[in-house]
């Protein structure tokens, strides 16, 4: 799902989040100065009344707020994709995403870090291709696939081709742990939580200093002409809530080359 954000004149902003996205920063943002997070408040109501659809009046009575305050709370949750708010009926319908977000907070289910911020000038943030139903996403500087493993993507020209089931393609740079890669036609598989990298122009990596293993140095000679696969974490561990020390795993699919005669 995605939502637009107002920006300066001629600038267009949009935020696109996975339905399984979770972050502690967003949790704190939703809570603000309240003593109890509004997500918990809504869940307390649905637990008490055993229903996911209710009116503003019913909710206001339960939380002991006036109807204007209750409506503002519900509308904010609707803007963030946790409920559907029907203004003509003054009725809220709770989405599964609200319950999943609470479970993610308590580490009871897996979640992901897929969140894209699009900022464009003179072009659309998102374009739907009606022939294949893929989304062309523009104006994306960087985004994160894994906070724990520090896997960050910087797409070339800010462009991503989003496909079914949160799979996507891009050209650009990949930072993964101690590796940095630059490639073309990179393919992300959401279910496998991996990147297929058929055309990697170069790979640089960091190693521990022999005299001080707390510090790193980049190997100056890049490995070139790679075809490889990056497995970010186990498919059922996208949040890295289980500590699996072997990830991320980078596997070369063919012979590669190191050119020692390059001066740069």
Where are these regions (language model features)?
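N-terminal targeting or signal-anchor segments and their processing/structural boundaries
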Residues: 1-264
């Amino acid at each position: 799902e995605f939502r637009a954000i107002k920006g300066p004149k001629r600038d267009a902003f949009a935020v696109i989040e996975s339905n399984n996205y979770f972050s502690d920063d967003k949790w704190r943002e939703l809570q603000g100065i309240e003593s109890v997070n509004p997500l918990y408040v809504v869940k307390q109501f649905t637990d008490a009344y055993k229903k996911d659809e209710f009116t503003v009046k019913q909710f206001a009575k339960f939380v002991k707020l006036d109807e204007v305050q209750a409506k503002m709370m519900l509308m904010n949750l609707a803007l963030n994709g946790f409920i559907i708010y029907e203004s003509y009926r003054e009725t809220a319908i709770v989405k599964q995403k609200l319950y999943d977000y609470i479970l993610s907070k308590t580490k009871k289910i897996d979640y992901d870090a897929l969140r894209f911020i699009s900022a464009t000038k003179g072009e659309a943030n998102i374009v739907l291709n009606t022939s294949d139903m893929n989304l062309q996403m523009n104006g994306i500087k960087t985004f994160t696939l894994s906070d724990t493993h520090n896997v960050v993507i910087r797409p070339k020209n800010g462009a991503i081709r989003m496909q079914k089931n949160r799979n996507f393609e891009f050209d650009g740079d990949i930072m993964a742990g101690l590796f940095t890669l630059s490639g073309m036609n990179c393919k992300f598989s959401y279910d496998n939580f991996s990147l297929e990298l058929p055309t990697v122009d170069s790979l640089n990596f960091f190693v521990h200093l022999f005299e001080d293993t707390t510090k790193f140095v980049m190997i100056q000679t890049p490995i070139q002409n790679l075809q490889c696969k990056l497995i970010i974490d186990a498919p059922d561990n996208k949040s890295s809530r289980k500590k699996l020390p072997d990830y991320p795993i980078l596997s070369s699919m063919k012979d590669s080359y190191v050119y020692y005669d390059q001066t740069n």
